[in-house]
Amino acid sequence: LLLEARERTGGRILSPSVTEHEDSKIDMGPTWLWPQLQPRMTQLIQKLELPIFKQFTQGNMLYENPQGQIQCHGGPSSHGQSYRFAGGSIALINALKNQFNTSAIQLNTKVTDINTESLTISAEQNGKAKHYSADKIIIALPLRLLANNINFIPELPSELIASWNNTSTWMASHCKLVFIYDTAFWREQNFSGEVFSQRGPMTEIYDASPHNQAFYALTSFIGLNAHQRKQLGKKDLLRACEAQLVHLCGTQA
């Protein structure tokens, strides 16, 4: 049984479609995997028969210093051993979801209470109270959200709750911005699409084109936290990112 508070499965994995083709998706959440470093993930992928492909790293990479000066480097990429899912990371979620009976996945079901002695769960589903019992309970939730959104019975030690609240969530402050193109002009210029910037607002950029090359894309990480992004505003942030990409890659961007 899977209880999911949202209206969809996948959590922080989100791969919206750009075209109608099944493989034409962009990863707005987690993107890469490393078979050499993740043997259990590799075994799972093989078991589920999911196709993966190597991150595009051919060509030069760019470095932008704090003053906006650009340097071109031809050394090996830090993503030389990185792979991506054909069809986006959501392909893994969909394959796992297919292992469940449809009735075993309860969407829009927010867990409110967990009794760790009786292994019973209270939840709210579309405004209605729900109750479940289990032999084992596995919680897939960032620790800060867990500490502030679920009531445990009996009450957990205050030291444990404090440690949860003091545990940062990996990549929680990051924001992605994706640029989509009909042609991969950077590849034609012997540029891998890889950029590292100390100026920003985008601090890292990578080639995010899908395996089927139905379109081409550059994905970026914005080096501003949520408060800074809110202060700047969406329109000005997008304008600054577009200007930076033109500065880095030329008017084709």
Predicted regions mapped to residue ranges:
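FAD-dinucleotide binding site
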Residues: 1-253
